[in-house]
């Protein structure tokens, strides 16, 4: 008995995806998505380095 008999003989390979043709609309859509992602990343970066949004603290009444 060899150790290989129990296993699969050939590895399973996924079929290669065909290169799809992209028209102008697809190219424009991809470009727009990239720009939106860049803007989102920039907004995240700006928000992460900021401090607290509200400076309210503990509210005090005027009564003593």
UniProtKB/Swiss-Prot annotation:
Keyword tRNA processing applies: no
Compositional bias per record (Basic and acidic residues), positions renumbered to this chain: 27-44
Region listing for Disordered, in residue ranges: 1-64
Record-linked InterPro entries: TMA7
Pfam families for this protein: TMA7
Entry keyword Coiled coil: yes
Keywords assigned: Coiled coil
Superkingdom of origin organism: Eukaryota
PANTHER family xrefs: TRANSLATION MACHINERY-ASSOCIATED PROTEIN 7
Family that this chain belongs to: Belongs to the TMA7 family.
Protein name: Translation machinery-associated protein 7 homolog
Organism for this UniProt entry: Anopheles funestus
